[in-house]
Amino acid sequence: MSETINTGAQFPTFEKPTVQFNEKGWGPCELPDTFKDVPYQPFSKNDRLGKICDWTSTSNNDKKYQNKYASTFGTGNQYAYYHEEDETTFHLVDTARVQKPPHQRGRFRNMRNSRSGRGRNARGGLNTHGHGMTTLNSKNVKARDTRRGVGKRFGHRGPPPKMRESSVAVRADWASIEEMDFPRLIKLSLPNIKEGEDIATCGTLEYYDKTYDRINVKNEKPLQKIDRIVHTVTTTDDPVIRRLSKTVGNVFATDAILATIMCSTRSNYSWDIVIEKVGEKIFMDKRDHTEFDLLTVNESSVEPPTDDDSSCNSPRNLAIEATFINHNFSQQVLKTGDQEAKYKFEETNPFISEDEDIQVASVGYRYKKWELGSDIVLVARCEHDGVLQTPSGEPQFLSIKALNEWDSKLANGVEWRQKLDTQRGAVLANELRNNACKLAKWTVQAVLAGSDQLKLGYVSRINPRDHSRHVILGTQQFKPHEFATQINLSMDNAWGILRCIIDLVMKQKDGKYLIMKDPNKPIIRLYDIPDNTFDSDDSDDGEGDDGEAFQQVYNYANNSNKI
């Protein structure tokens, strides 16, 4: 067979690769551009991986010959992680010597010259050593502690905190059903609750006197003692609620009871509310002859009043004083007299009969209902304190309240007579810190009643030691919803707390229950109590009628306030 070779065929050419010759060692003489600026580190596949935190590195105990039996692989630190301190938060410390006051200079000068033993600078019982150091023996240490009142307190400084008393004594036959702590209650929310619908309106209102808006510190006005009856009737004793309960609603209460529950997370003092469940209906009541209707003073302060009951600055006496100031102020700022115009609602005052000839406070009662969802209809009695006629002739309903100053030095507050005219915001901010719960209750009551304005009066003692005479230093007005936003009061959370308690009681059997705020813990407890509780021992309650207690403090003539 003959082979023919095609000389015209094209074959791929072979190009010799460039082989670099390194005369001084091994490896390439030049690096490609892709590998420039890359640090070199000997690497072996047997090396343990770890960059940020290498707990697997072996330790070498031979300190003298550390490179002995060592391998170059896995020892490089080109890719090691180093934690760098952030110096942006670094601050220099001022090490300059503090200049001592003149009375402290050289007070150890004589000790450096003293000798051990009895001398001019050494007293009996003192051990004076060299270098100016003086120590007491154990006997004198105990004597010194006794004089200072130290004693054995095991690290406690100052007197122990005073434990608050409960509003009602828990009895052995009460069964605890539920405990609700404040952190859980604060997270509750029930949004989109519409404005309440009026069912009935009762009472007569007097018009507000605008001259009180011009009062200031330099033009103060004495607080008068108004002899008028103020009714604080509980839910089941209200004849209108009894009538409405037959046709409308399944949860019944008053605005004061609702405000106490809705603002419970801001309260520190103990309080209690009695709840009766009859079928599918719930009635919320306050106990008779209790301090439920008294206004607290400095309840949320860092240092609340803790004086004994004999002092005029005790918590109870301050609450009585604040309650009377509030009642007198709300009636004094109105235009009184037979010749003055009055605003009359559809029905008369339900708590007085037609044949009674008594002077009743200016109060308008508005019975409203709210739809809370899940077939829960709330019916409550709300109150207005006065009315104001606008230039257009339309009435504006007012909720009139009073803040009182008792002793700014003891209350850690600000001097109203110095700051009220120039820095009213600072005065109000201080009151929001000291009386957060009370102001929140007033705001909730104004929102529930549908008041157009919330009038706040500033009333102070003429003399800090005299709790029976007061002067009006100024007034201020707010819109309830705007003021609620200003004091960080969420109505959605308030409705959520109320709905939570209603749902909890609805799940129980028919009977009587009690909600109580723990006096020393941020907890609300629900108890199942016997049906005859508080029925037979009201007269033996031990506290007596609050009206009698008021007269002992103020000694008002012909005072018949029903509280």
Curated annotation (Swiss-Prot):
> Entry's Pfam families?
eIF-3_zeta
GO CC aspect terms: eukaryotic 43S preinitiation complex; eukaryotic 48S preinitiation complex; eukaryotic translation initiation factor 3 complex; nucleus
Any one GO biological process: regulation of translational initiation
One GO MF term attached to the UniProt entry: translation initiation factor activity
Give the top-rank taxon of the lineage listed in the UniProt record for this protein. Eukaryota
Q: Where is the composition biased (Basic residues)?
A: 100-121
Name positions with the PTM Phosphothreonine: 128
Q: Identify the keywords attached in UniProt to this record, alphabetized.
A: Cytoplasm, Initiation factor, Phosphoprotein, Protein biosynthesis, RNA-binding
Coiled-coil regions listed: none
* Residue span of region Disordered: 98-167
Please name the InterPro entries in this protein's record: eIF3d (IPR007783)
Instruction: Cite the residue spans of the region called RNA gate.
Output: 291-305
* Protein's cellular compartments: Cytoplasm
Q: What is known of its domains?
A: The RNA gate region regulates mRNA cap recognition to prevent promiscuous mRNA-binding before assembly of eif3d into the full eukaryotic translation initiation factor 3 (eIF-3) complex.
Q: What does this protein do?
A: mRNA cap-binding component of the eukaryotic translation initiation factor 3 (eIF-3) complex, which is involved in protein synthesis of a specialized repertoire of mRNAs and, together with other initiation factors, stimulates binding of mRNA and methionyl-tRNAi to the 40S ribosome. The eIF-3 complex specifically targets and initiates translation of a subset of mRNAs involved in cell proliferation. In the eIF-3 complex, eif3d specifically recognizes and binds the 7-methylguanosine cap of a subset of mRNAs.
Regarding protein family, the annotation reads:
Belongs to the eIF-3 subunit D family.
Its subunit composition reads: Component of the eukaryotic translation initiation factor 3 (eIF-3) complex. The eIF-3 complex interacts with pix.
Name assigned to this protein? Eukaryotic translation initiation factor 3 subunit D-1
Gene for this protein?
eIF3d1
